[in-house]
Each structure stands twice: as C-alpha cells, then as structure tokens.
A protein has these predicted regions:
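A detector of single, family-specific signature residues
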Residues: 1-315
Length: 315
C-alpha cells in the first residue's frame, strides 16, 4: 500500500481501541491492553502508514502510543478540541467510536501533523509527579482558604491537613529532583535554572511539560505555549492580535516566572518597561515578556549554554 496516502486514526477508551484507516475505510476493534499492542503494531506496520493519529485522553492513550512509537510507527498525539472542530467543519456531527476513529484518520490526511507528544515511561513518570504536586498545591490553597471564620476545632483539623499536604509536597519535590538529576536531564535543567526568574518549580515544570524546548524555532515554541500573537483581520478591518490555545499548565508556570523575571532579569525587565513606557497595558506587556522569556529559554537550550547578559539569537 502506498504509504504516502495512508493515515490511521485510533479512538482510545479505557478498555477498547477502534482503529480506522484512510482512505481504505478499513475499521476494526481491539483491546486497550499491553498484550494486544504487539499484534496491533505488526498489522499497522504492514499498512506502511504515514502517521498514526491518537487523541490525548488523559492516561488511556499513553501505553498504546509508547508501544507503537517503539515499534517504529510515526505517532502523533492531537488535541481533542481541534479534532472535534475539524469534524464539525467536515460535517461529521454524529459521534461514535468508529466515526471518531475515521475522523482522526481524515484529520491526519488533511493536516498532516508532525509526530510529537509521545513520552517514554521514565519521562511520563516524572510528568505525573509534577502534575500530582500541582494538585496538592491547589488542595493546600483550598484548605488554607477554609480556615477563616471557622471554629477552633475545624481550624485545627484544617491545619493538620495542611501539614500533611506540606509533607507530601516536600516528598514529591525530593522525588522529582532525584529523577531530574539523571544524565539525560541534568544539562538542560542547569541551563533552564540559570535564567533569572526561573526557580526550582518552574524548572521542574518546563523540563517535564515542555520537553520540546530547544528543538523548535521561536514561532513554534511560542505557539506551543500559547503566547504567539494571532491576527484578527477581515477586509479593511484590522483587529487586535490575541493569544489563544497552547499548554495551559506550562503557560501558568511561565506567567509566574515572568512576574519574577520583569524584576530580576535585566533584558526581560528592560523589554517589559519599554512596552509599558510605550503605552501598552501592563498585562499585554507581561504576556509579551512571557513570550520573550520562553523564546530565550528555547534558544539557550538549543545552543547548549547557560544564561548570560548577552541575549542569544532565537533558535
């Protein structure tokens, strides 16, 4: 079969996979378990597909994606919202597992997304630790907010919960730092941490949730984070450019880092102040500074060098 024309879409559920092939309209089901992956990989390899398109489904797609990528197949993890928008534009309003699989295959054929998004088991474990830490921090904030105006008995209970959460957060920090001390992450961690404004938690988050850092150009990394300005023009109308999409957790991490960078990182501080002096709203200046910060980080990692006052050229 001509590999230039073949795309495979896989709809993933907890226990089941539905596989569709474009343009042959072939479709079949299999189980979503490790023992089924080798035979599925062999069947797909025989088709010589250009790409395997899988929606991000939390956890259920990850073992499948790793197994297929390890078998030598080109796997792309895609955003479910973008796929549903594509389905609507194509007039596919009905939704079944088989329809979803065919939509994924057609999405691949129409847009030809680049293979990206498959983490190995070790990287996924660290990312899970970072995500868990974020959950516990949010729980701690929620518990702290409940302490105001309650009885002493309830407040004491809340403080015990907070102490437990503090202990768990510290344990997670230790586990994450131990994992990131491995050789594959050590150099990148040192580069990221060298930038003024980037603290330990920002370093952990960027290494695990933005693994593409250093492999993309400036526009691509800004778009991946969701800080690439998008035009809003029509005819003679020229609308205000806005940012949209991207990885929310990474963007939140970088937002907090930028608040620090506009105070302690001289190039970022000068850039931010220049925009404010030019009349830009402070929030607009802050988002622009965030974009400059992530482009700077990307360039440093690409060039394998730590931060200095000399601003590196964007990758």
């Amino acid at each position: 079969m001509d590999s230039a024309t073949v795309y495979v879409g896989i709809d993933v559920a907890k226990e089941q996979l539905v596989v569709a092939v474009h343009p042959t309209q072939m479709c079949w089901e299999t189980t979503n378990e490790q023992k089924a992956f080798p035979s599925l990989a062999r069947r797909l390899l025989a088709l010589r597909p250009t790409g395997i398109i899988v929606e991000a489904t939390g956890r259920y797609h990850q073992p499948l994606a790793r197994a297929l990528a390890k078998a030598g197949l080109s796997v792309c993890i895609v955003n479910p919202r973008q796929v549903r928008q594509f389905a609507g534009a194509a007039g596919r309003l009905a939704k079944t597992d088989a329809i979803d699989a065919h939509v994924l295959a057609r999405y691949g054929q129409a847009l030809q997304p680049q293979p990206r998004g498959v983490r190995d088991a070790e990287a996924q474990q660290i990312q899970d630790l970072v995500a868990r830490r974020r959950q516990l921090v949010r729980m701690r904030v929620a518990e702290s907010n409940r302490l105001d105006g309650v009885s002493s008995v309830v407040a004491a209970s809340g403080r015990r919960i907070i102490r437990t959460l503090d202990h768990e957060i510290t344990s997670l920090d230790t586990a994450i730092d131990r994992a990131l001390s491995a050789e594959r992450w050590r150099d990148t961690a040192a580069i990221v941490a060298s930038v003024p404004g980037i603290g330990p938690q920002s370093t952990r988050s960027l290494l695990t949730e933005l693994p593409e850092l250093g492999t993309l150009n400036a526009k691509e990394v800004a778009a991946l984070v969701g800080v690439a300005p998008l035009n809003n023009d029509s005819g003679r109308f020229r609308g205000r450019r806005t940012t949209w999409g991207g990885r929310r957790d990474v963007r939140s991490t970088l937002y907090m880092a930028t608040l620090s960078a506009v105070r302690y990182n001289p190039p970022i501080r000068a850039f931010y102040q220049h925009l404010v002096d030019a009349g830009k709203p402070k929030r607009v200046a802050l988002i622009a500074s965030l974009r400059k910060l992530v482009v700077l980080l990307n360039a440093l990692v690409h060039q394998h060098r730590t931060w200095t006052l000399e601003v590196p050229r964007a990758a």
